[in-house]
A protein has these predicted regions:
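Conserved SAM/AdoMet-binding glycine-rich loop
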Residues: 1-6, 91, 251, 255-389, ...
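Terminal RNA-binding accessory module
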Residues: 443-532
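Glycine- and acidic-residue-enriched helix-capping/strand-helix junction motifs
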Residues: 14-27, 294-303
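Radical SAM enzyme [4Fe-4S]-AdoMet core and its adjacent flexible, acidic
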Residues: 283-307, 413-474
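Glycine-rich beta-alpha loop elements in corrinoid/cobalamin-binding modules
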Residues: 40-158, 475, 489, 512-514
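Catalytic cores of alpha/beta
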Residues: 102-108, 336-341, 399-414
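N-terminal pre-triad scaffold of radical SAM enzymes
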Residues: 10-13, 20, 171-241, 255, ...
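N-terminal intrinsically disordered, low-complexity, charge/repeat-rich segments that act as generic
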Residues: 364-443
Length: 532
């Protein structure tokens, strides 16, 4: 049985509006699960399918990986399936799977929704489909029964770390993504999140914290369950509910995956984790689950062992392939952490979530363990060791008042003075599986001060990018719709490349000189091709 996995992540209504060069870990993990189970498998980016629908006919089953924000892209794929009269099975997975009732109710062409992690249920589901047996015994699957009633066989499962490590993700990226050399490939190193704090609020849309504080001070295992049924983690984040406590993959499995991705053309690899500094911390509390966001301290030995093993790969050591990490929690940053990250990753970006400048609000309302002072300290240490900090902020969050926004304005000033390279400002969007899933963004009431924050962030980002004017940087080129985009080798703002017209250099590495900037993008003059 031939099975196609379609990567529709971050395609929104059918096209990308940002992060054009990102390949998430999930679809490659899923394709690996299917291939390792003995099925003939292909993985294709959304764009390769939407433009050549006839390829769908050769597959017995199609699995579409998507997020809640990708419903438009999913709808387009389902319309395509109908148009070509496709007769096989349609399975939907990824973060969007937690909306399985809506998916199955509104999309009769979907046969099954795989809820949550795929390692355990997916091979069983495919085996049942192949043999024509009833799928009722397969865990974490949603479907319509003969009467049309929507059923789920069980809640979603959290895959043990040893099973995650045993799976070999898909690495044949040249078959799956156009211009495959230009992307940042996310390699999963930690699944799940250690923040099992919860919002300490009551009387707000079903949130009724009883102030037991088990989630903050109790036994690590007991923190997984809330007497008031409040989902774990920051109120706006679905990771703890969907993917459970942090579990680390083995060093050998990570290094093997990176080595093979490089053989197949990868030039940039992100060590993917909700928090990279959770890597190996789960081993410090084993057999308990890692459900405390800040204690114990980072497992320095494991982090260095991982990074040193990766940098033993010749292409990484010679900097022909670049390695990045993304998100970290500021409460875990200390001198040892900054030293180790600087030793291996100097010159690269690193992302820190803060959300607002009000520490009390962050803790009690958001369920976030990070103080403003944590972030200031982390920024100073990381910059001192050669990292380039980015900081996340949010607006429209529930119960955020004028005081919260005033403090956020002051915090932006401080972050600017500390030399934060970029501040990323997000609008709050309620997601399924979060404490705030039934709350709407609160923007109109505070629109004036929110606009001040937007302008201040925009000004900061513009001033920061002005330092790039006149600099010559290495970029990977992507030709699209008559234009060239450049993605900096060491990460940074997308470059609109001028002075190069022939499409034959797409996928090549080039040298460009930055000559103008905007808050989100920069413009660069093409100088020469460095490698193809």
């Amino acid at each position: 049985m031939s099975i196609l996995v379609i990567d529709a992540l971050a395609r929104a209504s059918g096209s990308r509006y940002s992060t054009f060069d990102v390949v998430g870990a999930g679809p490659r993990v899923v394709a690996g699960i299917i291939k390792n189970a003995g099925f003939k498998t292909d993985l294709k980016a959304y764009e390769l399918v939407i433009n050549k629908p006839e390829i769908l006919r050769k597959y017995k089953a199609i699995m579409i990986s998507a997020m809640s924000s990708d419903k438009g892209a999913l709808s387009r794929l389902l319309s395509l399936v109908e148009k070509i009269n496709y007769k096989g099975y349609i399975i939907v997975g990824g973060p969007i799977s937690f909306e399985y009732k809506e998916l199955l109710r509104n999309n009769p062409r979907i046969n099954y929704v795989l809820i949550g992690e795929a390692e355990i249920p997916l091979p069983k589901l495919l085996d049942k489909i192949l043999t024509g047996k009833n799928v009722g015994g397969v865990p974490a699957i949603a479907f319509r029964d003969e009467s049309g009633e929507i059923k789920a066989t069980s809640p979603h499962l959290y895959t043990p770390a040893e099973i995650i490590s045993r799976n070999k993700p898909w690495i044949e990226i040249e078959k799956s993504y156009p211009d495959h050399k230009i992307y940042r490939y996310y390699v999963e190193v930690v699944r799940g999140c250690s923040n099992y704090f919860r919002p300490v609020i009551s009387g707000v849309n079903g949130l009724n914290c009883i102030k037991c504080f088990i989630c903050r001070k109790g036994d690590l295992e007991k923190r997984m369950y809330c007497p008031a049924n409040i989902p774990p983690g920051c109120g706006f984040c679905s990771v703890p509910y969907m993917f459970g406590p942090a579990r680390s993959r083995s060093i050998d499995s990570i290094v093997e995956e990176i080595r093979e991705l490089i053989i197949h053309g990868a030039k940039r690899i992100v060590l993917s984790a909700p928090d990279f500094l959770d890597y190996g911390r789960d081993l410090l509390v084993k057999p308990k689950p890692l459900t405390d966001p800040c204690y114990p301290e980072p497992n320095i030995e494991m982090i260095e062992a991982l990074l040193s093993s990766i940098f033993e790969i010749e292409e990484v050591r010679n900097r022909n392939t670049r390695i990045f990490i993304e998100n970290i929690k500021a409460c875990l940053v200390n001198e040892d952490v900054a030293r180790i990250l600087g030793k291996y990753l100097s010159g690269t970006t690193i992302h820190i979530g803060l959300e607002t400048g009000d520490t009390k609000y962050n803790s009690l309302v958001l369920g976030k363990p990070i103080s403003v002072e944590h972030v200031y300290k982390a920024v100073k240490l990381l910059k001192a060791y050669g990292l380039r900090p980015y900081v996340y902020l949010m607006y429209g969050l529930p119960l955020a008042n004028e005081k919260v926004y005033r403090k956020t304005l002051k915090t932006i000033n401080k972050l600017s003075s500390l030399g934060v390279e970029k501040i990323t400002l997000y609008k709050f969007v309620p997601l399924p599986g979060t404490a705030f899933q039934d709350l709407k963004p609160d923007i109109k009431r505070h629109s004036r001060i929110i606009n001040l924050i937007k302008k201040k962030v925009e000004k900061h980002n513009l001033m920061s990018k002005k330092s790039l004017i006149g600099r010559k940087i290495h970029v990977l080129l992507l030709y699209n719709n008559g234009k060239y985009y450049g993605y900096p080798i060491n990460h940074g703002p997308t470059v609109f490349v001028k002075g190069l017209t022939s499409p034959r250099f797409s996928g090549c590495e080039a040298l460009v000189e930055i000559y103008d900037v905007a808050p989100r993008f920069v413009w660069g003059k093409f100088i020469r091709i460095l490698a193809c």
